[in-house]
Amino acid sequence: MREFVGALIVVLAIAPEASPQPVAIRAIAFDEAIRLALERNPTVAQAATSIARADAILQRARAVTLPNINAQVSSTTLDAAQGFEAGITRPRNQVTFGGTVTMPVLAPARWAATARARADIEVATLSTTEVRQQVAVATAQTYLAVIRAHRQIEVEERALENARAHLDYAQRRLEGGLGSRLNMLRASQEAMVGEARLENAELALRQSWEALGVLLAEDGPVDAAGEPAFAVPASIDEASWALSRPDLLAQNAIVRSAERVVRDSWKDVAPSAEASFDPQYVTPAGLFQPSRTWRFTVSLTQPLYLGGLQRAVTREREIVVDAARFALTGLEIQARSEVRLARASVTSFDRSLASVRAAEARAAEVLSITTTSFEVGATTNIEVIDAQRSARDAGTAVALAEDAVQRARLDLLVALGEFPQ
């Protein structure tokens, strides 16, 4: 038994430790990522509560324009019944059942408040649309960051592969007595730098995964499954995109709401009328007090003098309108600038991408020629290392340029109000 236990301990001691399995990262297509972000992101849900709140305010404003019905019950006990020989005028115990029905028949101020509350729902809805666009743009930019990180890893892996191949060649030459330790150390240094750069690129990818997962309200990192295609319109009509941008639509709604408030200012001092119906039942009835009675009342109210309050309130509302119009003008200027800059950026980055791709091809050719020349003794490894760095930098430039083109196209669609669909 002891021999068996000892053998088991030896087997467990020499058995290799089970390596942890890598966690599978969920990959999501671009359109699906945008849809999930708009459905599940807490920021969108929080913005949507403003619509529900505006609707609740509308219901509250409408409530004061509808009939109100109240009921009352009261019991009265006197020290003794009151009356004379002809009968009792007030019984000692008496119960009164009453009711009140009131209805505003003329309420311009209340009606105006209801209209304002209805306009506020439109403002809240458009403001929520603007928040949805902001979340969608943040998701798209993070998605592009994931793609860029993947490209950068490919560049670093290719550069590290070249550096390790050169290091292997330098070591073989040194071992064969044909190379120098200096060349081997230079090649080793370049390989170590490549390993560090690859490690940094992989960490950047991990950070992008986590950021995308947060935006999609996922409990874990999310990867990109493919590259999005941003279709840029061939022609741009300002009259069209101005009606598509959520920020302009929301600000226009704010201006209209403020203008309505100013137009309705006179209703604050307009006459108001209210009708009320008050039935009553008393038991037991007194001699001079019938058991069933009712009263119908119509009251009319007209403010005559408010000490200048209405004039001040109207002026304040006019200032709010002016501020909203100024804000709208500023947004329109900014929007036109964003469209112009986005169009210029797309054209410029397209040209830059073509240039850096050509430069990358030439850098790869230079690296191939330099490596071959070094192997036949025509150059030193300094030229090889320099060519490797140039090829790596050219690959990085291509990755950045491709990302810049995609971001410029996204910015143009956002500026035109065409993203998200």
Where are these regions (language model features)?
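Bacterial N-terminal signal peptides
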Residues: 5-15
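Acidic, low-complexity, intrinsically disordered peripheral segments
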Residues: 19-22, 79, 397-421
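Bacterial Sec-pathway N-terminal export signals of envelope proteins
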Residues: 20-72, 80, 103-105, 118, ...
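Small/polar, glycine/serine/threonine/aspartate-rich low-complexity segments that form flexible
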Residues: 22-26, 72-105, 223-234, 263, ...
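Amphipathic alpha-helical coiled-coil segments and their boundaries
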Residues: 33, 40, 47, 103, ...
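Periplasmic alpha-helical coiled-coil/stalk elements that build and connect Gram-negative outer-membrane
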Residues: 132-244, 342-345, 349, 369-372, ...
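A glycine-/polar-enriched beta->alpha junction
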Residues: 35-45, 52-67, 98-116, 126-133, ...
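Hydrophobic stripe of amphipathic alpha-helices that form coiled-coil interfaces
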Residues: 54, 61, 68, 124, ...
